[in-house]
């Protein structure tokens, strides 16, 4: 059977102990099967690359028709934001801790990747968020987020105050440590730790989860992902907005942050037999069936 993907980019976290041999094992295996292998230049040194082309991460979406990440969810997040504009699918090999998105164990890497290349996979489209920071009617920053956009206080110990709007309708004002605006993918990350709901990845929803609100009546809510969410900082020093916990922008009072669903979803390819609830039970150590 002809392989579906011919140009494959490999990405790994170079600082992870033992990652380079696994990366090169996969590269050699793919090349032996006839694929054109590209390697992210942040993942290996030129000497380690063994002659494979090294490319910038910003070029992955233009040059590859599949990207395989060896690492944890943090690496997946950074690559997801780069690939989404190009609709390039993503496969995750688990080298991290929890690995909610990297669902292929290392010892099954070669067999699972071969199956995916021959069309045996479970595709899943997941939304991203597009956020813009507006100051005095001018956009001063923008970014994509695969997990969440987090509005929070900085190093100063006091709470911040802000107002929240959905589709230009006032929802509430809040005094708290901040607010998490989460995708379904991000609902098992910071949002979950803050008391937010777990959202199935295919659910067309966005969760708004307060961080340590002063009023106990401020509870998480979920809205349709077609909505535009806006929050405005009304009082607070050293406040910031974070994108997937990897990028951030410092805020000033009266700054507004506008958040909406990004136009392109990201497609993740899972191995055959993937079951979301099995994954949750395993990763979160939920109780097993009694019979």
UniProtKB/Swiss-Prot annotation:
Disulfide bonds: none
Regions that span the bilayer: none
Catalytic reactions of this protein: NAD(+) + ATP = ADP + NADP(+) + H(+)
EC number: 2.7.1.23
GO CC terms in record: cytoplasm
GO molecular function, one term: metal ion binding
Transit peptide listed as a keyword: no
Subcellular location: Cytoplasm
GO biological process, one term: NADP biosynthetic process
Record-annotated active site: 73 (proton acceptor)
Family, as annotated: Belongs to the NAD kinase family.
Full protein name: NAD kinase
Gene name of the encoded protein: nadK
């Amino acid at each position: 059977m002809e392989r579906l993907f011919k140009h494959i980019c490999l990405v790994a976290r170079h600082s992870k102990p033992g990652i380079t041999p696994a990366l090169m094992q996969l590269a050699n295996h793919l090349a032996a099967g006839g694929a054109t292998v590209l390697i992210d230049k942040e993942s290996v040194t030129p000497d380690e690359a063994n002659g494979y082309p090294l490319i910038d991460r910003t070029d992955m979406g233009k040059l590859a028709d599949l990207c395989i990440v060896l690492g944890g969810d943090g690496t997946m997040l950074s690559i997801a934001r780069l690939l989404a504009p190009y609709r390039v699918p993503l496969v995750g090999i688990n080298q991290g801790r929890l690995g909610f998105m990297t669902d292929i164990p290392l010892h099954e890497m070669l067999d699972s990747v071969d199956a995916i290349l021959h069309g045996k996979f479970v595709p899943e489209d997941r939304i991203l968020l597009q956020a813009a920071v507006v100051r005095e009617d001018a956009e001063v920053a923008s970014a994509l987020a695969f997990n969440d956009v987090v509005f929070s206080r900085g190093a100063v110990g006091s709470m911040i105050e802000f107002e929240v709007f959905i589709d230009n309708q006032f929802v509430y004002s809040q005094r708290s440590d901040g607010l998490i605006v989460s995708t379904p993918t991000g609902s098992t990350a910071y949002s979950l730790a803050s008391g937010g709901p777990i959202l199935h990845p295919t659910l067309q929803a966005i969760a708004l989860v307060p961080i340590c609100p002063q009023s106990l009546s401020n509870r998480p809510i979920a809205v349709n992902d077609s909505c535009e969410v806006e929050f405005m900082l009304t009082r607070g020093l050293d406040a910031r907005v974070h994108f997937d916990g990897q990028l951030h922008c410092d805020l000033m009072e009266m700054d507004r942050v506008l958040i909406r669903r990004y136009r392109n979803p990201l497609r993740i390819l899972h191995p055959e037999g993937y079951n979301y609830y099995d994954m949750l039970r395993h990763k979160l150590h939920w109780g097993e069936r009694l019979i």
